[in-house]
């Protein structure tokens, strides 16, 4: 019984210190969307080149 309380207390202490900085889910989503947007923008010239090569190859 005491061992369980000690483990629980240690878990609470570790969790309290680890969550000192709250995790903002909307900020993480915003970063993921920005990375996706930047990847699409940077892939644009390559996609145009492949499309042009395909149209040249097909006729």
Curated annotation (Swiss-Prot):
UniProt keywords, alphabetically: Amidation, Antibiotic, Antimicrobial, Immunity, Innate immunity, Secreted, Signal
GO biological process, one term: antibacterial humoral response
Protein's UniProt keywords contain Secreted: yes
One Gene Ontology term, aspect cellular component: extracellular region
Signal peptide: 1-20
Serine amide sites (modified residues): 58
Pfam families registered for this protein in UniProt: Cecropin (PF00272)
Positions of the propeptide removed during maturation: 21
Compartment(s) of residence: Secreted
Function: Has antibacterial activity against Gram-positive and Gram-negative bacteria.
Family: Belongs to the cecropin family.
Protein name: Antibacterial peptide enbocin
Source organism of the structure: Bombyx mori
Classification lineage: Eukaryota, Metazoa, Ecdysozoa, Arthropoda, Hexapoda
